[in-house]
């Protein structure tokens, strides 16, 4: 029987009225590595941020695993230089007999030794993406691929905050939110904060802070953070070099040493050091929708 044929067990109401979540088997807990889950509005640059952060951790000498949790499976392509097959694709090829898989079938080495996995997802409108993430972690555990890893980064689909795509929060120590200095991005961040706060009642995950990405200024992000008790822990400016790195299928650490590129690399290294050394667990108070409109100057 396919591991995806069985409906995932769910718990209702444990972290908010009407909440439905995928239950984590304690044996699937990731131990020994620091685990980060990256969220943000769709199209905000989570994959770019995750990949460059993975590269930065590797530059610090850490053994890194990045897990893409989006059916688009493009999370790791700047690390590997290609769109690698997903765990779900590989399982389909062996009729979901996971015991037939070898690590090299679904784990691919990227820039500076970063290990890359794309979980993939079920067809649109079917299945549970969170369950797919669980099966991916299960495979990694079965093949002992997490034992020699210092850092695990989950790059999570868009700003979806359902129980299924909150599944990486079950494994994460800290959640990081990628945002920009505009209303839509901050609005999405506010919703993600509410979701993480709800899940943290049952899981050990806590918020680490936010990254202002593709933003010349950070005034709106900083104003929001000050209001709710959150922290901006990095600022990645809106550089054409970042866009070009995506087109070249490379991380920023492989681009030419232009002054602006060097500065952004330093910011990623600083972010990696901050996360590795540990951040204070944050408990911001998300705002009602109307208050966000008022805060950011909308009538």
Curated annotation (Swiss-Prot):
Name this polypeptide is given: Light-independent protochlorophyllide reductase iron-sulfur ATP-binding protein
Entry-linked PROSITE patterns: NIFH_FRXC_1 (PS00746), NIFH_FRXC_2 (PS00692), NIFH_FRXC_3 (PS51026)
Summary of subunit composition and partner proteins: Homodimer. Protochlorophyllide reductase is composed of three subunits; BchL, BchN and BchB.
Recorded name of the encoding gene: bchL
Species assigned in the record: Dinoroseobacter shibae (strain DSM 16493 / NCIMB 14021 / DFL 12)
NCBIfam families according to UniProt: DPOR_bchL
Amino acids binding ATP: 43-48, 72, 213-214, 237-239
Disulfide bond residue pairs: none
Domain of life: Bacteria
Enzyme class (EC, first level): oxidoreductase
Segment forming the signal sequence: none
Pathway linked to the protein: Porphyrin-containing compound metabolism; bacteriochlorophyll biosynthesis (light-independent)
Residues involved in [4Fe-4S] cluster binding: 128, 162
Single GO MF descriptor: 4 iron, 4 sulfur cluster binding
Cofactor list: [4Fe-4S] cluster
Binding site for Mg(2+): 47
Catalysed conversion reaction: chlorophyllide a + oxidized 2[4Fe-4S]-[ferredoxin] + 2 ADP + 2 phosphate = protochlorophyllide a + reduced 2[4Fe-4S]-[ferredoxin] + 2 ATP + 2 H2O
The family this protein is said to belong to: Belongs to the NifH/BchL/ChlL family.
Record keywords, A-Z: 4Fe-4S, ATP-binding, Bacteriochlorophyll biosynthesis, Chlorophyll biosynthesis, Iron, Iron-sulfur, Magnesium, Metal-binding, Nucleotide-binding, Oxidoreductase, Photosynthesis
EC number(s) recorded for this UniProt protein: 1.3.7.7
A biological process from GO: photosynthesis, dark reaction
InterPro entries: NifH/chlL_CS, NifH/frxC, P-loop_NTPase, Protochlorophyllide_ATP-bd
Function statement: Component of the dark-operative protochlorophyllide reductase (DPOR) that uses Mg-ATP and reduced ferredoxin to reduce ring D of protochlorophyllide (Pchlide) to form chlorophyllide a (Chlide). This reaction is light-independent. The L component serves as a unique electron donor to the NB-component of the complex, and binds Mg-ATP.
Comment on bound cofactor: Binds 1 [4Fe-4S] cluster per dimer.
Region (Disordered): 1-24
């Amino acid at each position: 029987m396919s591991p995806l044929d069985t409906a995932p067990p769910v718990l209702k109401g444990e972290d908010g009225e009407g909440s439905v979540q995928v239950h984590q088997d304690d044996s699937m807990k990731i131990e020994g590595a620091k685990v980060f889950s990256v969220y943000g509005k769709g199209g905000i640059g989570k994959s770019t941020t995750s990949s460059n952060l993975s590269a930065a951790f590797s530059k610090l000498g850490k053994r890194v695993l990045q897990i893409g949790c989006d059916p688009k499976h493009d999370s790791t392509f700047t690390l590997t230089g290609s769109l690698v097959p997903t765990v779900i694709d590989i399982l389909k090829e062996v009729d979901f007999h996971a015991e037939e898989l070898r690590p090299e079938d679904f784990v691919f080495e990227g820039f500076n030794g970063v290990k890359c996995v794309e979980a993939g997802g079920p067809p649109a409108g079917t299945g549970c993406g969170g369950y797919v993430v669980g099966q991916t972690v299960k495979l990694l555990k079965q093949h002992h691929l997490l034992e020699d890893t210092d850092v695990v980064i989950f790059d999570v689909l868009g700003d979806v905050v359902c129980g299924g795509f909150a599944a990486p929060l079950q494994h994460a120590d800290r959640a990081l939110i990628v945002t920009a200095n505009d209303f839509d991005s901050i609005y999405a961040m506010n919703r993600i904060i509410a979701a993480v706060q709800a899940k943290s009642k049952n899981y050990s995950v806590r918020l680490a802070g936010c990254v202002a990405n593709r933003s010349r200024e950070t005034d709106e992000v900083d104003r929001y953070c000050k209001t709710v008790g959150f922290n901006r822990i990095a600022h990645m400016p809106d550089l054409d070099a970042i866009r070009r790195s995506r087109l070249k299928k490379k991380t920023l650490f492989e681009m030419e040493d232009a002054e602006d590129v060097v500065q952004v690399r330093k910011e990623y290294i600083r972010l990696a050091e901050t996360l590795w050394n540990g951040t204070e667990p944050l408990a911001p108070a998300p705002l009602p929708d109307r208050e966000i409109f008022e805060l950011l100057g909308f009538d």
